[in-house]
């Protein structure tokens, strides 16, 4: 803008005021534009994007749009250049009628993030409406007797424009009789009068035709005309006169129908009929006034006949005419101004727009959820509206502009606590009494994967019988996820690990959807007592969340193993055992002992022995111990007894159903003077096919002696090497038993240790020597694994002979096959979390004092097949805590290990040997210097003797 220097200080002041005005508009947060009405389509209004500080490139992605409901189609924004333009015809008179100020209020909304801008477009009036009179002509009756300067009212024109465009000037066509007199009222309206300038003469001029022209102040000027038809009357020369030219009345918009508005008073100086006045509305009155009011023609009372509404029309201007009954009648006019007063009869209105739903439960605070617009048709305090939100919700209302509010997030959301919020927004005006309105906003909370699947308990215990069919269902795990939809879709899987040397997936599987756990193969209690593993539950969210649960599957024992007899094998099968018994032995003499084991556990492995009746019901002088299996005489044998007895011993376990095995014992009575070897040979000769066994035993003795000699040399060589080479730490650490379950809760060890069978000679294998090989722990370090084989090899690379401390004694080899004598039941717990099982216990008061006795394991964590044997009378004291027993039996196997050297001067009790009829004399041991070799040879000799006995 360029100012002339002539302007001086005035131009500077104008520039300063313009700058201050622009700064105020920017600070108010609203843009202001102005356009003339009737602008063509596409007319430029303003660069709204540039003025709002928005980039043109972000208009389309942010869905920049006009959101006003009332005037949305009048103006539009070009998203390509950000220009606000005229979209359809704008008529100021249609928008604002007679209002002096006319503006279009627009709401411009941009998403991501949500922003609201307010634009006010002022509509400028143009002179597009000419002045208009109500009719094409006005008829005026004027008596000829009227005096000069008499005035006669005429109706003016109306212009729909405002301002200068509605400022009317009137001109009257030239006339000798009348001139135009214009008066301006305080309501900015003009009253027109015809003033008589010359006496009328009806006979000379009965009618006059004048042209009244109204011209507005617009550019270009517009005009309107009306023809005035003046009829000159005779006689009645006094018109009615009102006591007031203008009547002013105020009515509440709630005024009831029939209420008296005002009473008009008019008088006529004439007498008689010429003085009677009749009231009526002017002929040019609007239809709206005729529907709202009525006037009594005789009394002049104006009454209300319809409801008023301040919001529709705030004031009424009523033209009332008083006409006398003279001939011709004379009339006069007055004006009644009715102002309608506002009453708080309109409740506020709420509109919820631009909902940003659903909202994520992890949405940040102050996130805009919705826009709320309030309005009230009342005015003043009755139209002032305040908004509020229901309490105790994580939302709040923020006033962004007059009558505009934003619903924003005030605190953190949790869909699992509440997934939908039903909000109530209340708008209340300032009237008395105040009116209010409510709007409900349903806010749905979208789920976020913030909850992992949870199991009902951290660990489950399952009991499964062994020998289950493959693929059987053993348990169902279930996890619940508090999230929704995909975030709550749980899938299950195994946490893979190894069970021994096999993968966990070889034993069990879990269905991914249902959580059912299946056993893929038959489980064997004798191989696996406890299977502990974890099942993982994972949801389908992004990122996925998961948790684990531990399953402890206890495999319950079934009676699926029959008792197995431990006896010498002939031709690969268990044959009959032949025993020689001297005649004339006393009652209770132990003839033989039937040895059997059962691979099951508990009552399924508790064996009892029964002697089957002889053929023909003959009585036999023998009996068998119910739980020991020892065959003894029931009386003193004499010459009358048979020389040979065939005894059938039935071995039966206590399972359901019970399984059995039968042992055959051939007892031959010989003279007491015969040597045991001769008796043995005689029995073998009687047996027939057993004669060849004697020769085998002879060769076996020779082989054992050779092996013993080689063992002594090996030990000497090994000792020399050990003295010359520093020992390697960890090379001789015994391995730990292989664990079925490797969890931190504790585990049960295998009841069946790994066994290695060693045969002393070629031919049919015999269980003469059982070497214990403990399973090595998988956690051994590399040096232990590398050095372990060196402990078992000599310098030549050949396997070394076993240590003499790990051999059997003759008594142990004989006693290891004996059954346990059980009298009462005790309780053995399988360790933490394991099942409680009833176990038989051992009584020290056995009826056979010479027989072997056992004590059951007591306390948690002891293997179910581990039993401590006691031999000989007197029931020796058991080893206390921290003491090592002299002998122990390998669980699940017939091997008994001697871990201590026998005392050199102690005698071996005869009850430690099972001679099956042969007496073994007591031998004294040499001193400790020569004790090892002598004892080793003696034990080998005893083994040979036992083999020959068998």
UniProtKB/Swiss-Prot annotation:
Question: Transmembrane segments in this chain: where?
Answer: 698-718
The protein's gene is named PCDHA1
Q: From the UniProt record, list the PXXP repeat ranges.
A: 734-737, 799-802, 832-835, 873-876, 891-894
Biological process terms from the Gene Ontology for this record are: cell adhesion; homophilic cell adhesion via plasma membrane adhesion molecules; nervous system development
- Map out region (5 X 4 AA repeats of P-X-X-P) in residue numbers: 734-894
Q: Tell me where the signal peptide lies.
A: 1-29
InterPro entries given for it?
Cadherin-like_dom, Cadherin-like_sf, Cadherin_CBD, Cadherin_CS, Cadherin_N, Protocadherin/Cadherin-CA
In what residue span(s) does the Cadherin domain sit? 30-133, 157-242, 243-350, 351-455, 456-565, 588-678
Q: What is this protein called?
A: Protocadherin alpha-1
Question: Which PANTHER family does the entry link to?
Answer: CADHERIN-87A (PTHR24028), PROTOCADHERIN ALPHA-1 (PTHR24028:SF92)
Spell out the Basic and acidic residues composition-biased ranges: 909-923
Give the Gene Ontology MF terms in alphabetical order: calcium ion binding
Keywords of the record: Calcium, Cell adhesion, Cell membrane, Glycoprotein, Membrane, Repeat, Secreted, Signal, Transmembrane, Transmembrane helix
Instruction: Report the domain of life of the source organism.
Output: Eukaryota
Query: Which CDD domains does UniProt cross-reference here?
Result: Cadherin_repeat (cd11304)
Q: Which residues lie on this side of the membrane: Cytoplasmic?
A: 719-950
Record function comment: Potential calcium-dependent cell-adhesion protein. May be involved in the establishment and maintenance of specific neuronal connections in the brain.
Q: Which residues are glycosylated?
A: 257, 265, 548
């Amino acid at each position: 803008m360029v100012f002339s220097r002539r302007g001086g200080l005035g131009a500077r002041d104008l520039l300063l005021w313009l700058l201050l005005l622009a700064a105020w508009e920017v600070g108010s947060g609203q843009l202001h534009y102005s356009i003339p009405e009737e602008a063509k389509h596409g007319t430029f209004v303003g660069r709204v994007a540039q003025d709002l500080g928005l980039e043109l490139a972000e208009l389309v992605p942010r869905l920049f749009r006009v959101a006003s409901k009332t005037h949305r189609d009048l103006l539009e924004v070009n998203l390509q250049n950000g220009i606000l333009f005229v979209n359809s015809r704008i008529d100021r008179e249609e928008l604002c009628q007679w209002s002096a100020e006319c503006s279009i209020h627009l709401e411009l909304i941009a998403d991501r993030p949500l922003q609201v801008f307010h634009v006010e477009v002022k509509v400028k009036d143009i002179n597009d409406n000419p002045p208009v009179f109500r009719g094409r002509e006005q008829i005026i009756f004027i008596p000829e007797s009227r005096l000069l300067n008499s005035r006669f009212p005429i109706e003016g024109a109306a212009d729909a424009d405002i301002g200068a465009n509605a400022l009317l000037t009137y001109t009257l066509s030239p006339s000798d009789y009348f001139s135009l007199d214009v008066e301006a009222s305080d309501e900015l309206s003009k009253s027109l009068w015809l003033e008589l300038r010359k006496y009328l003469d009806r006979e000379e001029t009965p009618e006059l035709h004048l042209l009244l022209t109204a011209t507005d102040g617009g550019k270009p000027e517009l005009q309107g005309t009306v023809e005035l038809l003046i009829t000159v009357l005779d006689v009645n020369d006094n018109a009615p006169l009102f006591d007031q030219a203008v009547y002013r009345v105020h009515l509440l918009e709630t005024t009831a129908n029939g209420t008296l508005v005002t009473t008009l008073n008019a008088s006529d100086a004439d007498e008689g009929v010429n003085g009677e006045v009749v009231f009526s509305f002017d002929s040019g009155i609007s239809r709206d006034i005729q529907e709202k009011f009525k006037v009594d023609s005789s009394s002049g009372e104006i009454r209300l006949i319809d409801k008023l509404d301040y919001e529709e029309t705030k004031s009424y201007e009523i033209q009332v005419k008083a006409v006398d009954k003279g001939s011709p009648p004379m009339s006069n006019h007055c004006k009644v101004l009715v102002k309608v007063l506002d009453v708080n009869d309109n409740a506020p209105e709420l509109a919820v727009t631009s909902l940003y739903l659903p909202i994520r439960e992890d949405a940040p605070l102050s996130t805009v959820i919705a826009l709320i617009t309030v309005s009230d048709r009342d005015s003043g305090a009755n139209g002032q509206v305040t908004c509020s939100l229901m309490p105790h919700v994580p939302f709040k209302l923020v006033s962004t502009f007059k009558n505009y509010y934003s619903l924003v997030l005030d605190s953190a959301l949790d869909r699992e606590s509440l997934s939908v919020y039903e909000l109530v927004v209340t708008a209340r005006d300032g009237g008395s009494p105040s009116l209010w309105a409510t709007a409900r906003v349903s806010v749905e909370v979208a789920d976020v994967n913030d909850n992992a699947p949870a199991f009902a308990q951290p660990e489950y215990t399952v009991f499964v019988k062994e020998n289950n069919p493959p693929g059987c269902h053993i348990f169902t795990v279930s996890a619940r996820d508090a999230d929704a939809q995909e975030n709550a879709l749980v899938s299950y899987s195994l946490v893979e690990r190894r069970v021994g040397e096999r993968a966990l997936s070889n034993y069990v599987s879990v269905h991914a959807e249902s959580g059912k756990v299946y056993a893929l193969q038959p489980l064997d209690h004798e191989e696996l007592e406890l299977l502990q593993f974890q099942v993982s539950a994972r949801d389908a969210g992004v990122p996925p969340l998961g948790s684990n649960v531990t399953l402890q599957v206890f495999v319950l024992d079934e009676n699926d193993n029959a008792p197995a007899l431990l006896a010498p094998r002939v031709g690969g099968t268990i044959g009959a055992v032949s025993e020689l018994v001297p005649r004339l032995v006393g009652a209770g003499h132990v003839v033989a002992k039937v040895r059997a084991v059962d691979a099951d556990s508990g009552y399924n492995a508790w064996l009892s022995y029964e002697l089957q009746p002889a053929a023909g019901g003959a009585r036999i002088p023998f009996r068998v111990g119910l739980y020991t299996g020892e065959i003894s005489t029931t009386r003193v044998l004499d010459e009358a007894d048979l020389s040979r007895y065939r005894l059938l011993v039935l071995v039966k376990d206590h399972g359901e159903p019970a399984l059995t095995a039968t042992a055959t014992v051939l007892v031959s009575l010989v003279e007491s003077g015969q040597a045991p070897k001769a008796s043995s040979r005689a029995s073998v000769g009687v047996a027939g096919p057993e004669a060849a066994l004697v020769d085998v035993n002879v060769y076996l003795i020779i082989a054992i002696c050779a092996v013993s000699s080689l063992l002594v040399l090996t030990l000497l060589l090994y000792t020399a090497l050990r003295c010359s080479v520093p020992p390697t730490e960890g090379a001789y650490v015994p391995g730990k038993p292989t664990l079925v379950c490797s969890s931190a809760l504790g585990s049960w060890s295998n009841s069946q240790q790994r066994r290695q069978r060693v045969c002393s000679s070629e031919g049919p294998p015999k269980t003469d020597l059982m070497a214990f090989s403990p399973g090595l722990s998988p956690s051994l370090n590399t040096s232990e694994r590398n050095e372990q084989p060196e402990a078992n090899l000599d310098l030549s690379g050949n396997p070394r002979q076993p240590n003499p401390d790990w051999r059997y004694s003759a008594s142990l080899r004989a006693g290891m096959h004996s059954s346990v004598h059980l009298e009462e039941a005790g309780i053995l717990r399988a360790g933490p979390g394991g099942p409680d099982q009833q176990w038989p216990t051992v009584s020290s008061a056995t009826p056979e004092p010479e027989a072997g006795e056992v004590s059951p394991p007591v306390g948690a964590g002891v293997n179910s097949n581990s039993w401590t044997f006691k031999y000989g009378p007197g029931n020796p004291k058991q080893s206390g805590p921290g003491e090592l027993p002299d002998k122990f039996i390998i669980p699940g196997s017939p091997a008994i290990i001697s871990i201590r050297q026998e005392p050199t001067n102690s005698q071996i009790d005869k009850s430690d040997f099972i001679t099956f009829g042969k007496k073994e004399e007591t031998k004294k041991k040499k001193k400790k210097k020569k004790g090892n070799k002598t004892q080793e040879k003696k034990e080998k000799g005893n083994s040979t003797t036992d083999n020959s006995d068998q």
